[in-house]
């Protein structure tokens, strides 16, 4: 702007789309962000991989992509699975959509004791929280992937002598 004239940029995403084609999901994927997750001992810092989408009506050209980031930055308390409904409602209201999808995937760490020696160690569990809104109904799912170790009878027997923790 070299000549002191006020320039008005067009708001393309809010303009009408004459093609009249609805899009089921528009949004962001592959976001890695630090989050604070509620735990039995208070809260735990971790890093989440995030996907966030909204449905786009046939008469719209786009959505405000920066609002996804703003919504993530607005989570300022320890996150719990129950909050997925609240985050979904905020996203739909902010982006003026009637359908959406949110996915958070993160590692969660817990202290565990060895069965014989009772030594403490940290185990990581992969957690995936999803929320989906379709036909006015919000569905939340939680998936936890827990490592499993089996112990053969021979190993169990020699663990009494300190062979395994």
Question: Which positions does each model-derived feature cover?
Answer:
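N-terminal intrinsically disordered, cationic/polar leader segments
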Residues: 2-165
């Amino acid at each position: 702007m070299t000549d002191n004239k006020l320039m008005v940029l067009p708001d393309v995403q809010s303009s009408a789309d004459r093609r009249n084609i609805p899009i089921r999901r528009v949004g962001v994927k592959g976001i890695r962000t630090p989050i604070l997750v509620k735990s039995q001992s208070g809260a735990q810092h971790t890093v989440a991989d995030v996907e966030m989408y909204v449905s786009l009506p046939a008469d719209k050209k786009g959505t405000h992509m920066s609002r996804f980031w703003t919504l993530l930055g607005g989570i300022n308390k320890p996150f719990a699975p129950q909050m997925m409904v609240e985050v979904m409602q905020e996203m739909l209201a902010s982006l003026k959509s009637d359908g959406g999808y949110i996915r958070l995937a993160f590692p969660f760490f817990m202290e565990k004791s060895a069965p014989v020696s009772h030594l403490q160690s940290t185990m990581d569990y992969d957690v995936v929280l999803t929320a989906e809104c379709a036909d006015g109904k919000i569905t939340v799912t939680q998936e936890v992937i827990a490592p499993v170790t089996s112990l053969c009878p021979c190993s169990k027997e020699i663990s009494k002598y300190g062979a395994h923790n």
